[in-house]
Amino acid sequence: MIVSSDDGLDEISIAAETQVGELKAGEITTYSISPGEFGIEQYPDCNGLQINNAEESLTMLKQALANENKAAAEIVALNAGAAIYVANLCEDLLAGVAKATEVLESGLAQEKFDQLIQFTQLTDG
């Protein structure tokens, strides 16, 4: 799956339609998706998601995983859902986004991220 949003992102956007190219069973299909198809509000833009450095990126990721930044959580759910779908862990993109949303809202994504941090601190140096 290759995606490109109409607002210039190289990922599925919460602020515009996204063009999708998908290779499945030897056939390439192209189609457009929009946030509303997944029950996600379409934002006027992605300005609130812009970051300037690694620290801001980490802060926004933590906010998304903790559901403290709705826009960040929703763009993570859309793109993680696409990864779940591409990994053949669900029937379609809608189910992938639903699963990603469930994992985010349950706190499991936050828990796994915390475990990753702990693991890397144990193995560092």
Annotate each language-model stretch with its function.
Residues M1-G125:
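Glycine-rich anion-binding loops and their surrounding alpha/beta cores
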